[in-house]
Amino acid sequence: MKYFIVKRALLPAVLVMALMYALITCDNNDSNVAVHNPDQSIVLTSFKPDSGRIREMVLLDGDNFGNDASIIKVFFNEREAKVIGSTGKRILVAVPRLPGDTCILSVEIGKQKKSYSGEFRYKKEASVITIAGNGIRDPRIFDQGLDKAQMQPMYIGADLDFNIFLGDQSDVLLRINEEENLMQIIATRDQGFNHRCQVIVNPSTNVLQMGAEGNGNRDRFAFFDPKKGWAMTYKFVKEWDDNGYTRPAHSGFIANPVNGAPSGSPNSFETHYHCLYCPIDGMYYTRYHSGAIVRIDPDTWKAKIIGMTPMGIAYGVAMHPINQSEMWIGYDGVADANTGIYAHSISKVDVLDDRVGLEDTPVGNAKILASFQKLSAQSYVSGHRDGPLYQAQFFNIRGISFDPDGNLFISEHGNSDIRMVNTMSDPMMVETVIGIPGVAGYINGPKETARFSGNHGLVADQEGNIYVSDYNNNRIRKIAIE
C-alpha cells in the first residue's frame, strides 16, 4: 500500500515533466539537430520562473547549449540540478533540494561555465508529524506499536537502513522502525546504557557507537553491530599517549557554579558522550568535558590526546560529511563554570590539525588547538537570532546533526525550535526551519504553526528527514524539509 501511494504521488510530477519537455521541444523551430559547438561561447539570456520549490521546473534560455543533456550541468549556487532536456536554445531543469534562499544559476558545458544575471529565490517548505509516542511518560510502554508508546525521549540516532535509535530517560536504548511499526529494546541500564550518550552510526560499517558518562568511565566505549542483533559490546582504551596534555580525570567539584549548577556539582571531565568516525584516517574521535580531543586507533585501542578545546558540556557533536576532518561542537548553556563565552555556541575544530594556537584563553591556560573556531556570536548570552552564523544566537543546544549536503540541524532545548546552518555558503547562514522560538507546545503541521517543547536530540537520515526527541511532549517527531 505504501509503495502504491508513493507511485501515485510521483505520477503528476512525471506528467508535468513530460509535458514541459514536449513544450520546449516544440519551441525549437530549427529542424536540424542542435549540437554544442565547443569553439563558440555558450550564451545565457534569461530564465523563468525566478522562484520555486524543490522539483519544480525552470526554463533556461540562451544559445549553443546543444541538445545532449548528458553533457550539460546546471547549478543553483553550488547545488547541481537535474537536467531534464535541452533544445539547444532552452534547457529544462528541476529545482534541487535546499540550494540556498537566493541562488545564482549557472550552466557548465565542457570547459565553459557561465552564470545568469539575477537571482532565483528558493521557497523552502517544512512540516512535522509525530511518528511515536502518545504524550504520556509513565508507565513506560515500548511493545504495543509506535502510536501507543509511552516514553521520555532524550538522544536519537539513525542508521543506514532507516532504523531510528532512541535513548529513553529510563536508561533504555530503543530501536524504532516506522515501516514495521516497531519499538524494540536494545540495551538497558543493567547493561550499562546511559540515556545521555548519543548513538552515532559509523558511515562505513553501519555499527552504532557511543561514549560513556561519569567518573570512572573515561576509557569505556559501547558498540552495537546490526549483524549481531545490536547486542551491546564494550571496548576500552588500552594505552594513553598524553602528548603533553592533562589526561581527562575526575577533578573534584565546581568551585564557582554558574548557569544554575548547584554548589559542589561534580566536574565530570571523564565524560565523553560520543564516539565519532573520521573516514579520512579511519580513526575514532571523541571530546571529553575537559575539552580534550582524543584520537583512538580502532585496531590497537591506543588513545592520543591531540589537543584541547574550551572545557564544558557539549551534548551535540558531529563530523562534517563534506569537510570530513571537521568536528562540529554545540556547547550547551548549563556547562561547567569556566565555559564562559562558549556557552550556547556553535564551534568547530579540525581533528587532523594538531597545531597549538592560543596559550591563554577565556577558559584558562589550556593549549587550545589552532583550528578551533567559535563560529556563532561572540557572546555567551542565550537568545535567538537568525542570519549570518557569526551573529547568530542560540539557547541550550542539545543536539546537532548534518544532512548529506552539509546542512547542520540544531535542536534547541531552550527555544523549543529547530535551526539550520548552511555550512557551505559564504557567509554561513542560520535560519529557524520549524517551531516558534520561545513558544512551547505540541502542534503538528507546517512551519508557521508547528510547536515543540523542550526538545533534546535530533538526527538527519540519508534522505534528509529530521527526527527529533520532543522531550516534554514525550514523542518522536519527524520533520520533512524541502
Where are the regions that the model predicts?
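C-terminal motif of bacterial Sec signal peptides marking the signal peptidase cleavage site
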Residues: 21-25
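Beta-strand/beta-sandwich contexts
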Residues: 27-67, 71, 101, 112-129
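Gly/Pro-rich loop segments of beta-rich domains
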Residues: 60, 124-154, 180-195, 214, ...
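Residue-level detector of Asp-centered blade-edge/turn motifs that repeat once per structural unit
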Residues: 158-161, 201-205, 277-281, 319-324, ...
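Conserved beta-propeller blade signature
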Residues: 163-166, 206-211, 282-286, 326-330, ...
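Loop/turn-rich, solvent-exposed surfaces of beta-rich toroidal or solenoidal domains
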Residues: 393-422, 434
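Blade-level signature of beta-propeller repeat domains, shared across WD40, Kelch, NHL, RCC1
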Residues: 446, 453-482
